[in-house]
């Protein structure tokens, strides 16, 4: 089993070391607001991580109107916040609502194609990556560490999510059998990834821990 270490968070921050290799350490973090100092990076640097996975809300640049100047500006400021050593690591990223472009946003957000392109450009996603030619930012990445195959999966719980019911302070269950969080294509993709017989360890980023899954038929 991985050894898990919790550090002072952005909002949620996890470190763990995979026991198959004493040299492999992957950092996780989310909810990183570019408007404020980020002293947490000093503590992270002391951990000598090899890779970093951004779990969402990697910037705060909500643009419900579709004017993306605010979002682009947020990314530019975030880039200046990142320490130099972080730029030398491999980074994986998935978004949540504040880098998606709309607070609590889901499939109804009209500008999601545009904000997805901005997301892809910021994280230097290659032109031949499937995410450049499909809807949603979900991904998988395989690693071989001391003959163990490890699969990292990031799920997009914004792009396809059915509308929330009720008010922000009084959400209501969604009993519509046609409602979804991932949508059929992402579910099928996920099933295929999880059925990989050669993978011994899965690391999955999914929906926020405080969202009540029973509010959806998934």
Regions of interest found by a model, annotated:
Residues 15-17:
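N-terminal signal peptide c-region/cleavage motif recognized by signal peptidases
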Residues 9-10, 19-21:
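Cleavable N-terminal signal peptides
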Residues 20-218:
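Metal-dependent phosphoester/phosphodiester hydrolase catalytic core
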């Amino acid at each position: 089993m991985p050894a898990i270490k919790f550090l002072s968070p952005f909002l949620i921050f996890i470190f763990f070391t995979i026991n198959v290799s004493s040299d492999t350490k992957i950092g996780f973090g989310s909810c990183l607001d570019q408007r404020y100092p980020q002293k947490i990076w000093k503590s992270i640097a002391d951990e000598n991580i090899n890779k970093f996975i951004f779990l969402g809300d990697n910037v705060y640049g909500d643009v419900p109107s579709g004017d993306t100047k605010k979002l682009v500006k947020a990314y530019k400021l975030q880039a200046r916040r990142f320490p130099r050593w972080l730029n030398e690591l491999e980074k994986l990223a998935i978004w949540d609502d504040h880098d998606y472009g709309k607070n609590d946003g889901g499939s109804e957000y009209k500008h999601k194609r545009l904000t997805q392109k901005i997301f892809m450009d910021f994280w230097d996603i290659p032109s031949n990556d499937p995410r450049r030619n499909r809807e949603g930012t979900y991904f998988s990445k395989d690693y071989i560490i001391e003959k163990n195959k490890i699969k990292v999966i990031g799920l997009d719980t914004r792009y396809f999510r059915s509308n929330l019911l009720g008010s922000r302070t009084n959400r209501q269950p969604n009993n519509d059998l046609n409602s979804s969080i991932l949508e059929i294509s992402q579910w099928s993709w996920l099933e295929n990834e999880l059925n990989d017989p050669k993978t011994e360890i899965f690391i999955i980023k999914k929906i926020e821990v405080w969202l009540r899954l029973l509010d959806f038929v998934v």
